[in-house]
Amino acid sequence: MPMGYEKFKPSQNNLNAPNSGRIKIESEDFLIYDVPGGGQCIFHALSLAITGNLSQSLVYRSLICSEIYNNFDFYEDQLKLSHHSNISRHAYRNKMVHGNQWATSTEISVATRILQSNINIWLQGRDGHSNICFTKEEYINSSLSRNVDLLLHQNHFKLLIKNSTEKMVSSFIRQALQYSRKAMKIHFQK
């Protein structure tokens, strides 16, 4: 099991990266975390989501792409569709296992199983009236798996973390009210 799987649940408070803004998609408010590109962005985003930093990016790339390479016959047809060409086992190793080619739907679907995560990819585009719109691609491992939300815009993945600031403030206010009620009860019982 990859490092950090059991221990880490991402929130904006424990990511070792600055957020680069907010975005509202459907009814959810997300913080956006940009990651380095260069063909590694999805692996960087997955590492940031699972461990809170980028330290496992190459490990995740190696685990995911080696699984495909080692079972190439099983994934070959899917690879032809996702890589838009007949890719040989040798070429796959050079481009994906040891290289820095972008991940495709094949690598993402394998990542869900290896990283035991549901991966939601939000594709940012424009509708017929030039309004920003989003399309969601879901890669599901299981209903019990953690959810990782990614934004894909201009061929670059960014991590999305649900912004729970409002929920945290509400929770704090609720706790403060409960505390003051208890304090008042104690005061009046004296």
What are these regions (language model features)?
Residues 1-3, 49, 190:
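N-terminal low-hydrophobic presequence detector
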Residues 11-133:
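Papain-like cysteine protease catalytic cores
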